[in-house]
Amino acid sequence: GLVGSEMCIRDRSRLPECDFDDPLGEATGAGVIFGASGGVLEAALRTAYHTVTGENPEIGEQSPLKVLRQIGSFKELEIDIKGVKLHCAALSSLGEARRLIQAMKRGECHYDFVEVMACPGGCINGGGQPIRPSFQNKPKDCADRDQCLRAYDVNSAIRFSHENQAVQTLYDEYLEAPLSDRAHHLLHVEEY
């Protein structure tokens, strides 16, 4: 098999092309934007919108998810789903997270959904990226990588997490349904 071939071939460029095993073989545009700050929040809200309305939301200029303000790595967003407005925040860096938590505890702000990524700009600027000291933490380079992910999303055949066949199979065969007791127990964090 392929494992045996890999062990015998030192030049990996000579390995035959093949598809990834499930569940990693199929990707969605929503999954790709997970790599940028705000991407997980946006992908989750796309699916929430579909769950409530039965329709996929517009993406891009016509999206119901609106950026209200952006200051550095902090974005404040809002989405209206059938008359229910959700106030959201997306930020990157643990220092930003600490400041937001303190402001929320003091009652200075309220958010229904907060996404925090530890690395500035998100995973696109994280430890899994090639180490290039001239690149790290440069906002323009992070913005360029963000735009690459967004372009991939725009050109993806499947743009919504809930349309990923592997995710659908996982719910059908193991988690029962979104928000089921089993899914809630395994996937949701109440406190940490």
Where in this protein do the model-derived segments appear?
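Short flanking/linker segments adjacent to small metal-binding domains or redox-active Cys/His motifs
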Residues: 161-192
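Short, small-residue-biased leader/transition segments that mark boundaries at the very start
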Residues: 1-8
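Local cysteine-cluster metal-coordination motifs and their immediate loop/turn environment
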Residues: 113-131
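Immediate flanking context of iron-sulfur cluster ligation sites
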Residues: 101-118
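Catalytic phosphate/nucleotide-handling subdomain of diverse soluble enzymes
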Residues: 131-150
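Accessory "access/gating" subregions that flank catalytic or transport cores
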Residues: 31, 35, 39-45, 56-95
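Flexible, glycine/charged-enriched surface loops at secondary-structure junctions
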Residues: 12-18, 54-68, 110-115, 160
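A conserved mid-domain beta-alpha-beta active-site/ligand-binding segment of alpha/beta enzyme cores
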Residues: 10-13, 18-48, 53
